[in-house]
Amino acid sequence: MAINPITRNKIKDYLNSFIQQQLSVYSQRSLREFQDVDSYPSSLSKDGDLKPFHASLIPASIMRLNRFERSLSTGLGSTFEECTRLIALDHHAVALRNYDIQAALDQAQWAAIDQLISTIDRGLKHQTPSLNQMLEQIQSIPLTGILETHIVRADLYIQRHDGSELFFEIKSPKPSKGQCLEVMQRLLRIYTIKQQSAVPVKAFYAMAYNPWGISRASYRSSITKKYTDFSNAVVIGQEFWSLIGEPSTYTELLEIYHEVGLAKSAEITQKLLQ
């Protein structure tokens, strides 16, 4: 079993708390129901959430469910980070969220990273270079002798029992161009900071699941493939969770999410449809 019983209970408690928090936030926001053509459009909303055409067509109960689902989806990414940390603690020596690396590098190295990202952004190359190719460029530039200190934050840091290190940026499996460029910049900065490390270091753009299917070959985001080193920098779904735990980690975690969902379904339905 990749996720031991104690960790399973910790994850369940965390997910239950997450859903309760989402319900609490939702309950504090009222949803204006469409009564008639005159009253709804003339009402005011400080949150800017009036949707007169939606509300006139769709039953209020469905609108409430839709709003809750959107809110839940927004916060779901944070649950992946915490579940990853909890599972990793059972398999590795260290697992930390929001891990900061502070380092002083030559001014030219920081500038070279930014220039590479700018080149990718402007599409000056038909295909994004591999991380290794970009790191070779950074390491080959003339140095200025002027040091600059920067802090780079990783969503998750893992130190394995053999001392090797893993850094993860856990982001959406359907990212924007800007998100891809931001992650690539962080990965390049981490690798450049760690270039003299005595232990193996790997840094990844991690996606908790694949929206197109179970296999890597089924992944279809053209933005990700264009603006990242997809072959070497990106881990998706099961391959990501296998790095955190074991090959069965992904399916075991889905089972936990499903168990919590079943246990909370009646409460969620009652609060949203009342």
From Swiss-Prot:
Disulfide bridges in this chain: none
Catalytically driven reaction(s): Endonucleolytic cleavage of DNA to give specific double-stranded fragments with terminal 5'-phosphates
Family affiliation: Belongs to the TdeIII type II restriction endonuclease family.
Keywords noted in UniProt: Endonuclease, Hydrolase, Nuclease, Restriction system
Function: This system is less active than isoschizomeric RM.HgiEI.
Molecular function as annotated in GO: DNA binding; type II site-specific deoxyribonuclease activity
InterPro entries: Restrct_endonuc_II_TdeIII (IPR019045)
EC number: 3.1.21.4
GO biological process, one term: DNA restriction-modification system
Name listed for the protein in its UniProt record: Type II restriction enzyme HgiBI
Transmembrane segments: none
Keyword Protein transport: no
Domain of life, per lineage: Bacteria
This protein's record includes keyword Iron: no
Source organism of the structure: Herpetosiphon aurantiacus (Herpetosiphon giganteus)
